[in-house]
Amino acid sequence: MKKVEISYNKSSVNLVDDYKKYGYVILKNVFEDNEIRSFRNEIKKNELDLEKNVHRINNNLKDVLSYPKLSKALLNKELINTIKQLLNSTPVYFGQSSFRWNEKPSRGFHNDANNDNECPFQSEYPILRIGIYLQDHDQTSGGLKIWPKSNSVWQPGRALLKKIIKYKYSFKNLFPQQYLKNINVKTKAGDVVLWNLRTAHSGSAIRLKYFTNCSLSPQIENFISKYLNFLVKPIGTERAVIFSTFGAESHQLNNFMKYAENHEGLKIIFKNSNWNDLVINEGFSLGLKLNNKLLERFK
């Protein structure tokens, strides 16, 4: 299978088709240099504030819309319009978002379609995640690794056999060709990756110094990082990323929110988060539905 880079400077007639086929798209140049600097400075400031009291760090976490200067990253017209296209519906935001600053690498293929009990090659999944990357990863380590087309196939894991037995699905799509190839997504600062929550991915991808375009499995990357780190091409700057989840009104979104409601880490974020009137009005003007059910649930 050839390597695939699904990139767009602006919305395209092929964007939705490619998202459905490959499980992700890259939206290029969404943010200007001054916005990137502002977001990076704000993330660094808030991370340092959290670190001042290590024992309370988890108790102070909030969602991105609760930080006025960072909220602009999610309340972006081009980004929201793209999400509308991909979901073919009004996007719903329910408070699941976060930022990262120089986070310790955690590698391993997984998907985030929690509480999803449907067959991936017989149904669509109307929930996606965005990653706003605030430094270049086209030639350096630290970016996103993706399995193209993994959004529409069974993925090996501990829950797979249980699903096949329970729902009487066949093994025909279990080990397709796409499991033999993965890619390190080539993002530049200000790009946004949008991927279906069923798409298998891994964070903090490694690029080698001498084979920059070679994408390895996360297990091999962990070995190289620990024992052969001299082969790794470093990021070159502090790694800053913003993540957020959006969905369309559906039973799948309801199921996912039930999962989120019982996630200990997310409970803390929901409890601490608060959207001011300016954020609510801006979201409404962009056609974004802000669902504060989980925020109110844990107040």
Task: Pin down the residues of each PLM region.
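Double-stranded beta-helix
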Residues: 137-204, 208-221
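Short, conserved beta-strand element in jelly-roll/cupin
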Residues: 119-139, 186-189, 194, 245-248
